[in-house]
């Protein structure tokens, strides 16, 4: 597909290897194999008109909420709910536009509680208030969630009883927060079987009860291809 500043676009619908040429002399497509030339020409008068025709061809794509296109603040992680709220408050004091803040890992506590889907770190002792404070300043929050669980978490125990955990080593390797990993204390973290519908229901149950119901606005789905 290419789109011209002259208000039209061309979608070249061919599944073989295709060469696209665009220079001062010509704009062209050339495919190695094909029973016929198959393409869609879309004239929309302007860029928006062309994109509208593409959407009619491929199907309507829902837009994310407007706030997701604004400025986001993040770092390796915030170590307490007070730090999260203070960062948002500082942006407001400075008059710098901010739409979202991202909380990365370890809000659940130590590695044996990996991805507990619950704020078990004592520095996040009132996550409901944290969410209310962030929202009161007209900001939003996203949080890191994983496809794996530590052996001391409720999701792990329920999934393990039902045989819904994969049996391979994943990150973090050690239960201790040291580097390099101390393998005398393996973390026991395991990835759940997302191909199993019942396992997905269990995953959502804990995610909903522990985080979403607090008013969390977005997920950062970390390690979707397990380390």
Give the predicted meaning of each segment.
Residues 1-227:
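Catalytic-domain carbohydrate-binding cleft regions of carbohydrate-active enzymes
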């Amino acid at each position: 597909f290419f789109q011209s500043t002259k208000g039209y676009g061309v979608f070249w619908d061919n599944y073989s290897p295709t060469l696209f040429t665009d220079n001062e002399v010509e704009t062209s497509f050339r495919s190695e194999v094909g029973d016929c030339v198959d393409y869609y020409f879309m004239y929309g008068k302007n860029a928006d008109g062309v994109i509208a025709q593409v959407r009619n061809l491929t199907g309507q794509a829902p837009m994310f909420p407007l706030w997701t296109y604004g400025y986001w603040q993040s770092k390796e992680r915030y170590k307490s709910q007070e730090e999260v709220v203070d960062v948002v408050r500082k942006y407001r004091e400075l008059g710098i536009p901010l739409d979202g803040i991202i909380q990365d890992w370890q809000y659940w506590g130590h590695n044996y509680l990996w991805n507990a889907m619950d704020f078990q770190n004592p520095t996040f002792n009132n996550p409901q208030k944290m969410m209310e404070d962030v929202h009161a300043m007209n900001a939003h929050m996203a949080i890191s969630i994983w496809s794996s669980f530590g052996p001391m978490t409720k999701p792990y125990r329920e999934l393990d009883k039902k045989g819904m955990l994969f049996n391979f080593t994943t990150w973090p390797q050690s239960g201790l927060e040291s580097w390099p990993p101390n393998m005398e204390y393996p973390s026991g973290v395991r990835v759940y079987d997302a191909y199993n519908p019942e396992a997905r229901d269990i995953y959502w149950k804990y995610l909903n009860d522990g985080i979403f119901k607090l008013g969390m606005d977005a997920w950062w789905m970390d390690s979707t291809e397990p380390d």
